[in-house]
């Protein structure tokens, strides 16, 4: 059989292009609509005789469910109807010319772009108009079967690979979780289910697509299924003073330091089980209970011995007993935090804030507590082999102020001890009270976990409040990808940045809306019993999501790489610094603008990107190839940090990064790697 096109003629009365074929020496005219790109020839004598392609015709496009725009392919429509056709009796089947007519009717819409759903709706209507009800039913079943396949659970492989210990991406995503332990695996399995539902059901397709393409990173999808938040500053002072409730049991205010330490660790564990980020505790609130213990021992020895022994001896007894309780209480904190397992499959991610406030009536007791915490951290905790090692938690933050900055202050001895501790155990981290007061309206307070900072907020009485506040969640933007897409052209870079920021805003609002309407019953320890608030049972948490009470964070990755692409130099070079600062200021302006427009506490946040810096770089390397100093390294530099390959001394690095910390007030941390300093203190 042979078929040859030998002439074409346009009809004057119809917008149809007639194509004449020589089919086995018989001239066959076949009409085709002008708007077709790729047209299968009319069905003749039970066989198709070729394909017609008029390249001058306007291309027809189809918009898929995920927003992608693809070329129109009529074959897919024909195949779908034919599959339904094969499912019904012969008398219910639709003839091939009728199928062709349906397809032609769709193509005759003269639309440059059709939605997939619209095409399917038209097919169903056509089948019904032909009175092919059984066929229409089969097509509808076919349509929705395909939809179910698209929306089918996609977690089987990831869950089975977790159980088989072969899913390295998930197992290594969080270094604080031992993915081989059954209880941790249960959390990771739940996380895979949450990620699957988040992508298929909860998030708009454009956000999921942006996440998959590395345009942005929607953090903590594995917990997005539930109405829980990121990180917080526990209002531990209120909980210890006014009591709390755990597992339906009333916990009254402690009468001693040891009990206060035990209750605090129980609170930390309960809080960690109902949120996914870090938490911080200001140990200043423990000083009061150490004094209670002192008074208890003084009363005991006065009653027991009276004037039988001198006051000096009684004071020695009190001192010894108090020191024993102090050591035991701090040891309780350290061991409980490192041995308790929360429902999210790890030890509580908690930070102890070691701050001596000169106006604190319990400053002497708190100095004793800080000293014991540092001494026990220097000692370490024994591992299973009996060797002292550095515990991962609690993370320690030590505040440097006028009275302990090694300039003759009363508490300089604590700073020397902290330095000794850092040299051996890497912690504590340090905060400058002076710099914090400059950047946070005169206030000194802890970050939430590792680096997320609240913005100043005043209650109805005009008093600043930080404890009992939280962060709603994080979305991070991939800055180097914008520069790579713009090919280093600033005229393209800045408009594209605006588009990506708009996408990040939408993603962040998804986080915010997911928390709106949440009832306090979801986590009583947070919302009803003091960690965050003392709401009524069944009360919505919405008022805590607005007016800047809580924060929501825009993270960012790769200021160094972005600057390198756009300027050709590092952001430590004056030319690069100028661009990097403009970029950071634009990110900050976006957050400030969103905050004004919505009343929600948007903040700019230097993302903790231990795994994300690799993910973004890997995605971009596949798309843009290996680019020197950008994708060839296999990672992007975290936030505004100096590239680790750059030769720069520790003090110069801190000085350089300081200017970015002021802009990134919603979260910032700077660090250096140093050799063994234990013999250089």
Each predicted region: which residue ranges?
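Contiguous, well-ordered alpha-helical segments that form the cores/surfaces of helical PPI scaffolds
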Residues: 354, 552-565, 585
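Short, positively charged and aromatic/hydrophobic N-terminal segments
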Residues: 4, 16-27, 34, 40, ...
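Charged, amphipathic alpha-helical regulatory modules used
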Residues: 48-162, 166
